[in-house]
Amino acid sequence: MKYDIYFHNDFDGVASAAILLNFLRSRGDGFLEYKAVHFPVSSNWADLKFKNPTIIVDFLYHPKAIFWFDHHPTAFLTPAWKKNFRQTKFHHWDANYKSCCHLVLDRLIKNFDFKPPKYFRELALWLDKTDGAVYSSIKEAMNIKLPAIQMGLSFEGRYRKEKNIDYFKEIIEALSRQSFKKVAQLPSVQARFKEYEKRLQSSLNFFKKNLILYQKTAFIDESVKDVSRLRYAAYYFYPKIFYCVELLKHNNKEFSVGVGSNPWRRPTSRLHLGNFLRKYCGGGHQSVGRANFKTKEDALKAAKEVIK
């Protein structure tokens, strides 16, 4: 059987899809169409009519999906869907997982007797680090020589809202067959990473000059200049802060507000950022979340509310 695959448009979503593709291929199945999805969710998600059997990973639940795996606490679009949801071997949700990639791997092994290649285990452990922000130090988090960091960066910046599915398809296919360390050396990955690397120093300088402190929270407006996104730069320059709020501009002229907590100095309040951003139709995890806006004015207003 051939399935349409819906996946979150980041490294975790792509890796989750790759593991599923390897599993499906072992049964003589595969993917038909590739659909990269992102937050905020369009209003028609609940009414979406799938034309083919569908798999969804690292994204919102939909009861019509044949397979669904996710680890986001904000996985259910409606209270009714959450109330009526039942865990099965085909539909599984566990917000305790740092990455959806690791969740998919574990469930396929346990419920379908999947025999994965050894490199999938290493992939899952690295996704726990990158998606769960559990690096051993700020130095490791900022080490762009690491293959996993380079892979993750290839989906960031101006590529975050990319509509061309070819790159996603290429990487999912490649990750399903070989180690992510080998995939990171592909010309397409390196081209994206090199573009990021060229702007790294100027981006660091921009962050150092433009980070604004509000007690234990830092704010940076990245929409005013074309800079590389540096998720941990605020904690690099100001290691004692608890939160960083980012305002970003995307290729489609939309804006987003991202909020993260310091992985090396967690705030005592333990505010759930993903749930907090649901008021703006966003989502995320305990320590990181994002919401999108049509205008900069709306994004700035939300950023100020978040900082308060």
Regions found by a protein language model. Give the residues of each.
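Long, charge-rich alpha-helical interaction segments
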Residues: 152-191
